[in-house]
Amino acid sequence: YCPVPVSAMYMRPLKWILLFLLVFSVGTMWYVTFSSNNGIEHTNPMYFYEYEPIYKQHYLFTLREHSRCRDIEPFLVILVSSSPKDVNSRQAIRATWASQNFWWGHRILTLFLLGQDTGREDDAAALSVEDESILYGDIIRQDFMDTYDNLTLKTIMAFRWVTEFCSNTRFLMKTDADVFINTANLVKLLLKLNASENVFTGYPLIDNFAYRGFSRKTYISYDEYPFQLYPPYCSGMGYILDGKLAQRIYELMSHIKPIKFEDVYVGICLNILKVNISVPEDEQFFLHKINFDLCKYRHLIAVHGITPSEIIGFWQDMSSNTSVTC
């Protein structure tokens, strides 16, 4: 009898474990890669269209700031998608890139988009948002639940608010609360744009695959979206459009079945309206955070993935180093 070495006894199950992990990894990669290609090849946004306005949303405004545009002619309205508990981001934005009402003599108006708090402390959270609204007068809210899957409802609310209460704005920007905006450069860009009612620009996403993998956040089912590719759209981190186009999109939204991703949903509307995305000439929109560099941040318009403390720090650095040349 020849005893089996202890090391060999442990190696056998280890081999099987490694083999299983290898097969699982290959299988996962295959699924993620090829399942994205199983949808309908040619994207047809009219698939989502209904002749009757059956998708008109009837959520009620619980905070609406309906008089903000009554006595002014805004050049630009910036609507920031936020969540009830994200007070720090709103405070950071108010103290930094939304702190000035005028840039180059043009009136800028910034407001925040919220749904109802989903947490256990609903009453307390709602009360604090109400207090915040009284203090700053810059919160728009409807009575849907504030969840990731309801971001499209929040964007529909934004377009409805502009249409009903601020139809005189020249431009609209929809952005997120974790975005740093160089407001001066944003206004400069808008002043350079052609006076067209079809202007729509931001960080363009062209020929983006509909994701069918395991990440719930980016997954979309075939039932909800049966096509391989999304139509051209701009990332929801910050897109800008003509005020009249915003009203046309809102009117169309009543006919378009909402999908999970608000930026793709707006892209579907643009496609049906036959509006092309204007691709910025310079790289000024950043989908992912870039490290702070004074000259880079002086040149950009919007960068995504920035914390409230970074928004404040970056703004202070830019404001205190105006004499530095790039």
Model-based region annotation:
Residues 1-326:
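Secretory-pathway lumenal glyco-enzymes, predominantly type II signal-anchor Golgi glycosyltransferases
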